[in-house]
Amino acid sequence: MNKFQLPKTLKSLWHHPHNGELISINGWVRSIRKLKNVCFAMVSDGTCQQALQVVTSPEQSKKLSYGASVNIEGQLAVSKNAKLGLQQYELLAEKIKIYGQINDDNYPIQKKHLTTEMLRQIPHLRLRTAKQGEIFRLRSDSLKALRQFFSSKDFTETNPPIITSSDCEGAGEVFTLTPQETHKNKSFERDDQKHFFDRPAFLTVSTQLHLEALALGLSRVYTISPAFRAEQSHTSRHLAEFWMLEAEVAFMTSLSQLTSLMEDMIKYTLNSLMEQNYHRDHWDQLLKPWKCMTYSEAIEELSAVKKTWKYPPKWGNDLSSEHEKYLCEILHKTPVFVTDYPQKIKPFYMKSSGPDTVAAVDLLVPQVGELAGGSLRKDHLDEYKTYPPELQWYLDLMKYSNAPHGGFGLGIERLIAFLEGENTNVKETIPFPRSVGSIFA
C-alpha cells in the first residue's frame, strides 16, 4: 500500500543536497529581487535557519511577492556564488504555485526593521520573522536534548497535575480556579458544595510535591509542564504562564549530587546543540567548571564590594537580582551555585543543613540571574513542626517508608533566554507570552 509522504523540507534538503536533483519545496518568500532578465527569491519554510535561493524568469515571477506562500518545483543546482562561500545550492524554478499573498500595505511584518517591543504587540504574526523562528527552533532542540539527557540517566517522564489544592512555594501568588458563571450551574446550589472540587483549587506554581510522591515509587522522575504565578512583575525574567522542567531523585543524600546533576544536564544540552550547528559566543565559557559557594560566602563577597547597592547585601535577606548578576557576571564570570540559604527565607519542605540554614541551592547565570533552584527535601515526619493543613497527604510520604530525596526546578523560558544571550527577554522565548496586564489571543 502506498503511503502518503510529507513533502521534503529545507532542513532535510540541506542535510543531503544533490546537484541536478528534481525537487518540490513549500515555503514563504522572505525576500525578492527582480532584475531585467532574472528574478532571485529567498524562500524559507521555517524548519531551519538557512533559506533557499530560487532563480526564476521574469515571466514566472510576475505575481511573486514578499510574504507569499508558495510551492516551487525545479532542479537543484550548484550556485554560481558557491566559490565565494555563499549559498552552495540554488533552485532553478520550473513551476511556481502561489497559495496566498499579502496584498495589504498595512501588513505589520514588512522588510523594515521592527524592534522586539513592537513585535511583542503582534505575537500571532511575529512568529513569521527569522529571529523568532531561530529562537523557537533553539527551544525545540533544547527540550529534545533535555529529554535525551534524562532518558540516559534512567529517569521516567511524568505528568503531574496542573490543578492543585495547595501553594507549593507558600508565596501566595496563585491563580484561583473556578467554573464560569457557577450561579447558573445547578450542581453548585447546595450550601455544602460551594466549590467545583471539594475545596479551593489553583493553577499550580510548581509540581514538586506531586513529583516527590512519584519519585518515591519510580526513583527518578521529571516533568516539563506549564506553571502559573500571579506575580506583579514587569521584568525581563517574569511571566504569568511559563514552562518548568522539574526533577526529583530518590536516595539523593547530598547537595553535591544535585549540583552535579544540574550542571551535567545543561552542559549535555549545550553539547547537543553544538552538534546540531547551533552556537553562541558565550557557550564555550559555559563548558568550563562552574563555581560553587555557600550563601554566607556570597554575602561576604558582595559586602566587600565597594559599590552602592539598591538593596545592600545582608545575611538573612534573599539575594536580589542585582546581587545574583554581580556574582556570576562580575565577580566570577561563570555560572555560580549558591548553597545553604537561611531557613527563614526558604519553603517549609527543605532539609536542614545547619542550625539556621537549609540544604538549598540556586543556580545563577550571567544575564538572567536565577535560572534554577532546588534542595534536599525533609524525609522524616518529626522534621515537620508546622505545615499547611491541606498537605496532610504529603506527610504520608514521610510516614510510610520515606527515603532521602532531592530535586530542582528550572524555568524553560529563562534557559532559552540564557542560551540565546544578548540579554534576551523571556517574552521572546515563548510564542504567546502572558504577563501582568498583558494577554493576547
Swiss-Prot record:
Top-level division of the source organism's lineage: Eukaryota
CDD domains for the chain: AsxRS_core, EcAsnRS_like_N
UniProt xrefs under Gene3D superfamilies: Bira Bifunctional Protein, Domain 2, Nucleic acid-binding proteins
Keyword Cell membrane part of the UniProt annotation: no
GO MF annotations, alphabetized: asparagine-tRNA ligase activity; ATP binding; tRNA binding
Gene Ontology biological-process entries: asparaginyl-tRNA aminoacylation; mitochondrial translation
EC number: 6.1.1.22
Subcellular location: Mitochondrion
Keyword Mitochondrion applies: yes
Chief location bin: mitochondrion
GO CC terms: mitochondrial matrix; mitochondrion
EC supergroup of this enzyme: ligase
Reactions this protein catalyses: tRNA(Asn) + L-asparagine + ATP = L-asparaginyl-tRNA(Asn) + AMP + diphosphate + H(+)
InterPro entries linked: Aa-tRNA-synt_II (IPR004364), aa-tRNA-synth_II (IPR006195), aa-tRNA-synth_II/BPL/LPL (IPR045864), Asn-tRNA-ligase (IPR004522), Asp/Asn-tRNA-synth_IIb (IPR002312), NA-bd_OB-fold (IPR012340), NA-bd_OB_tRNA (IPR004365)
Keywords attached to this entry: Aminoacyl-tRNA synthetase, ATP-binding, Ligase, Mitochondrion, Nucleotide-binding, Protein biosynthesis
Pfam families according to UniProt: tRNA-synt_2, tRNA_anti-codon
Family indicated by similarity: Belongs to the class-II aminoacyl-tRNA synthetase family.
Name of the molecule in the record: Asparagine--tRNA ligase, mitochondrial
Gene field: slm5
